[in-house]
Swiss-Prot record:
One annotated GO molecular function: 4 iron, 4 sulfur cluster binding
GO cellular component, one term: cytoplasm
HAMAP family tied to this protein: Lipoyl_synth
Keywords: 4Fe-4S, Cytoplasm, Iron, Iron-sulfur, Metal-binding, S-adenosyl-L-methionine, Transferase
EC number: 2.8.1.8
Listed InterPro entries: Aldolase_TIM, Elp3/MiaA/NifB-like_rSAM, LIAS_N, Lipoyl_synth, rSAM
SMART domains in alphabetical order: Elp3
Identification of the protein by name: Lipoyl synthase
Amino acid sequence: MTDLTATPAPAEPAASAYDPTAKQKAQAKTARIPIKIVPIEKLKKPEWIRVKAATSSSRFNEIKTILREHNLHTVCEEASCPNIGECFGKGTATFMIMGDKCTRRCPFCDVGHGRPDPLDADEPKNLARTIAALKLKYVVITSVDRDDLRDGGAGHFVECIREVREQSPATRIEILTPDFRGRLDRALAILNAAPPDVMNHNLETVPRLYKEARPGSDYAHSLKLLKDFKALHPDVATKSGLMVGLGETTDEILQVMRDLRAHDVDMLTIGQYLQPSEHHLPVREYVHPDTFKMYEEEAYKMGFTHAAVGAMVRSSYHADLQAHGAGVV
């Protein structure tokens, strides 16, 4: 007699439990943001989008080796910056402190999300030793968002600035900070102890796109951070950066530029957004070089002391030359 009893199907493998301490990239990171990413037909890159590779005679491998030896991260690597070959090749890097896991999930950014590790007490000294070993005259120090810290990480920035100045007194320091949302007054009071040579905080995009591109951030708050810092340190240059190609209009970018000047921001960067992966926000437009040129001309008319504007410009790209152009170094 035939046995008609159904054979049980193999058990489905249990879904892996969500691990908040793991570094999430691409889909794992963006899947949990409130506004879902809707894919669109991928635009063909125009001929003016060109990345410079490191040359065989460059310092690319030397820089990577030194960074690993000192257990340091760079935003160049973590955010998949297209200029990494050129910058590492010239012996420059933007150091990313406080770990490689961000508490935010911005869907334009390739830095990983997750519950951050405790701060590394040795990081300020390791950073300073690395900068001294590389003989860098201008450095940019940035960080992941650390919403888990009472001061947003401001105290760690100060420790890093102090250590770098101790070991490399002639080196100029630019910091590119998170927004310190919910702890701004505390963070600014702490930064008073060791202000940088340039204070940079990026608005990133126009206010209409904040909910989509910068969940957890606030346009007015970011402007207030820049203005309040400048009020405390009128002799320190302030700086901010924007991406284009996310669906903003020309008029919206010009209005953001006016807002920045109204909040006493001195320096400006504008560059083309490039999608890190198919799970990030799509590129909706490749902005023409003529439009970048117009933004640059308008920036100087508005009174910015320096404007770095172009498709491949990033906030820290040639930051030393930007600072020199603004009279900082």
